[in-house]
Amino acid sequence: MAAPITTALDADGVLVATIDMAERTMNVFSVELMDALDALMDRVDADPAVHSCVITSGKSSFLAGADLEMVRGYGDAARTRTHPQMFEMCGRLGRQFVRLEASAKPYVAAVNGLALGGGLELALACRMRLVADDPRLQLGVPEVRWGLLPGAGGTQRLPRMAGFEPAMKMLLSGQPVDPGTAMKLGIVSALVPAPKLIDEAKAVARALHGSAYDPALKFKHLAQTDVPAPGNGVSAAVAAKHGVSGTDYEFYPAYAAIVDSVLHGARLSLAEATTVEMNNFLRLMFNPVAGRMVRTLFLERLRAEKELAPPAGVAVESLRVGPISESRAAWQAALGRLKLPQQTDDALPPDTVEVTDRAGAVHSAALRVTTDAPAAVAGAQLVLSPQGPYGRVIEIAGANDAQAATMAALAMHLRSLPWRTPGPVSRLATLQGRTLEEQAQQAAAWASGSDPAFIDVAACLAGVTPAWSGGPLSWQADR
């Protein structure tokens, strides 16, 4: 298998290191890539012909963060390993970035595409960060969405570059920014037309030859004077200022861990601050919430998206839609964004859709939403969930195989996860409004005839079960 990092040294001593992990659509930090990064830094340190290093990607994206299978392994390890053992294992990437940042031979990031999580943290550790000037490119730290925090220096370098409030907005929302916004925030050194990115990065690296690392030059907000001192209630107040409700702060421990990392690391060196950050990361690893969220909202969700997709060759040609009632207006909005031929037909029963497939067959279904009272419906029904932070679900209940396949194709057009259930009563509507204990009891009764993980995925994506639970069955398993 090809090495994950390949290098090319030019005559001026600029080493271009290209990350391109074989058999992956995106680069992600794995043990293999961390090993390769150590080898790269060893070479840069030892080779007198190397004076600087440009890090870029051989893929259309730069680096998409940590391998979440590896992160799930961290969660499993936390059940049996001690804190020092976990610190050594989980803190490796953060220590690598401290070493890279302080190197006498400067590193320059040439960010050619999406950089999330550990990918952005790698760029932040570099002396300079050049980014392709493409408004579609995303830079961010989405870890809070999986119940985690950026554990390789993200909670420390972002506030030192962008300032406290802008950094907290990124860290607590998990929302990415485009290159122009990143430039205004000070987390990007320059925007460069994509075709010129490597040449410009090499020129910047060349200009840095022989210069020592100076944190005061790198970080505009090094003194962290805008960061409040930690104290009773301060972390909760910071989170609340950035839109975190009291309930979410209580049930999602990542919010407190992120704010605590920033407050307690603010006036320390980067090496000391990343230790603070890692201790807070381990708070989350020893808490089952992060493990449940990673498992359900990422790993099992990806599996569901593959296994619940319509069969190859099944396609939607057109739709006829009956009058839609006010209580199901979400369907009106969703169908209004659909780029397929459709017509409204008042002759159809209210809240009904007829979908014509590629073969000309017509499939009918009742249109429902998750807030409808659970009730038996004759024939197929499509139950639409609200659009949530992790996506949207269309439950396909009571459909035959041909109907289910076509309705799954429609769900894909609507950017929704198609979840087929036997019906005639919607399972999402049945779970809506119940306590977690009641949901777990009901879901257990369904599990023998369904993939239990998909029940959890659908319940969380639909918003009928809180994301911190990982779904009713995952929550029950951890009790």
Regions found by a protein language model. Name each.
Residues 155-165:
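Hydrophobic, secondary-structure "cap" segments at the distal end of domains
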Residues 57-95, 115, 145-147:
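Glycine- (often His-adjacent) and acidic-residue-rich active-site loop
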Residues 31-34, 166-168, 172, 178, ...:
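Intrinsically disordered, low-complexity segments enriched in small/flexible residues
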Residues 1-56, 98:
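Conserved CoA-thioester-binding segment of acyl-CoA-metabolizing enzymes
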Residues 94-146:
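Glycine-rich beta-to-alpha active-site loop
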Residues 304-354, 376-389, 400, 406:
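NAD(P)+-binding Rossmann beta1-loop-alpha1 motif at the extreme N-terminus of oxidoreductases
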Residues 177, 330-337, 374-380, 386-423, ...:
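Internal alpha-helical scaffold of NAD(P)-dependent oxidoreductase catalytic cores
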Residues 354-375, 393:
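ADP-ribose/adenylate-binding Rossmann-like module
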